[in-house]
């Protein structure tokens, strides 16, 4: 081999090797499976209940059944408390299912 071939090989070797300064290291992804796609980035987080929860954030308000504070909501308006959701409705039998959507 001639000296020019050796010089070219040396230049090629220097051009293809990259010495990175560890102080300026950028984390590299070694597998394409670790790259987040747009669908992975946009996932909704589940609402998690905290320990000793008092805010009831995790409960579904649509499926909760109202429980009377005073216990006399079925008797009619004169016996209902001020925050009663049954206010304005006629008296009903205790234990009857009341659907507000039909009103």
UniProtKB/Swiss-Prot annotation:
Region (Fe-S binding site A): 42-55
Disordered: annotated span: 19-103
Localization of this protein: Cytoplasm; Mitochondrion intermembrane space
Motif Cx2C motif 2 location, chain numbering: 81-84
UniProt main location, coarse: cytoplasm
Residues given in the record as [4Fe-4S] cluster binding sites: 70, 73, 81, 84
Biological-process GO terms, alphabetical: iron-sulfur cluster assembly
InterPro entries documented for this protein: Anamorsin, CIAPIN1
Pfam families named among the record's database cross-references: CIAPIN1
The keyword Repeat appears for this protein: no
Cofactor or coenzyme needed: [4Fe-4S] cluster
GO cellular component: mitochondrial intermembrane space
Disulfide bonds: none
UniProt GO molecular function: 4 iron, 4 sulfur cluster binding; metal ion binding
Motif (Cx2C motif 1): 70-73
Domain of life (superkingdom): Eukaryota
Function: Component of the cytosolic iron-sulfur (Fe-S) protein assembly (CIA) machinery required for the maturation of extramitochondrial Fe-S proteins. Part of an electron transfer chain functioning in an early step of cytosolic Fe-S biogenesis, facilitating the de novo assembly of a [4Fe-4S] cluster on the scaffold complex CFD1-NBP35. Electrons are transferred to DRE2 from NADPH via the FAD- and FMN-containing protein TAH18.
Comment field on protein domains: The C-terminal domain binds 1 Fe-S cluster but is otherwise mostly in an intrinsically disordered conformation.
Subunit structure: Monomer. Interacts with TAH18. Interacts with MIA40.
Protein name per UniProt: Fe-S cluster assembly protein DRE2
Gene: DRE2
């Amino acid at each position: 081999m001639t000296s020019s071939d050796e010089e070219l090989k040396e230049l090629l070797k220097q051009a293809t090797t990259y010495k990175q300064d560890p102080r300026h290291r950028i984390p590299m992804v070694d597998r394409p499976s670790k790259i987040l796609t747009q669908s992975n980035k946009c996932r909704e987080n589940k609402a998690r209940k905290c320990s000793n929860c008092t805010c009831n954030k995790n409960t579904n308000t649509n499926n909760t059944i109202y429980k009377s504070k005073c216990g006399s909501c079925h008797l009619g308006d004169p016996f209902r408390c001020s925050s009663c959701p049954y206010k304005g409705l006629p008296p009903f039998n205790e234990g009857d299912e009341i659907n507000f959507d039909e009103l």
